[in-house]
Amino acid sequence: MNSFANFSFEYGASDQITPLVKRLIAKNPGPFTYTGTGTFIVGTKELAVIDPGPIDDDHLKAIIETSGKNKISHIIVTHTHNDHSPLSKPLQEITGAPIYSYFNEAMNTKTNNQFEEGYDNSFIPDVIVKDGDLIKGFDWTLEAIHTPGHTSNHMCYALLEEKILFSGDHVMGWSTTVIVPPDGDMDEYLKSLKKLLERNDNIYLPTHGTQIDNPHDLVNKYIEHRINREEQIIQAIKSGNFKINEMVKIIYSDVDPGLHPAASMSTLAHLNRMVKNNIIKVDGKGLKADYSII
């Protein structure tokens, strides 16, 4: 699944992606962020900043410099991981722009993500966005699409004037996303992928990775990848590997062992879905449970 082409960029410098969209990449590369967080600036007069990124003074300065004399009127967040939302507040202090995001207060009570970049549990938006809402600026319109799975509060945003989807971490341009229970939900993730197949967006711009020019092809590949993974899990259980750590050693044998803890959480997400759909049964809870075929 990691067959994406590299793309050229320079930290601190913006790239004009389309007439209405510029991208800046924060200098926070890593195993879950690829080259770093891509911040998108939408519009020509009134600007929307999508996913400001992590706390980073240099990145904040680059956003302000890229906006020039134009007003930043909206700050928009796809979801509240620490590589996406924390810079919203410092940016708001400078610009006065309201912060827009889906908000689920209960999410903060069920997050347990020691992987990826962690949760921004202090985040509260000024404007709560719901599925189907339209956010409008001078020369742009963003449609909000609720896409839970990676997180329960994940939103994608469609730029209607250019048929572009800002896909956040739901569909990334370098790898499949990580699903970490309890807030991450594999069943919801697959439903959200299928939801995107009902749309006609021409291009996806993910927060991590390169532009996606054939989005439906990639979404179908991601769905196929997850279904194949569940078949691998079934075969592992049939071979006598009843615990998650045993399954991971077999299924992810070609992956750096240092990433096996994250792979264990992804496997747990698959198992939760398979239990829910009466494919397998579970005895116990979490990573120490035993699983068997029904």
Feature roles, as predicted:
Residues 78-84, 150, 208, 270:
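Histidine-centered divalent metal-coordination motifs
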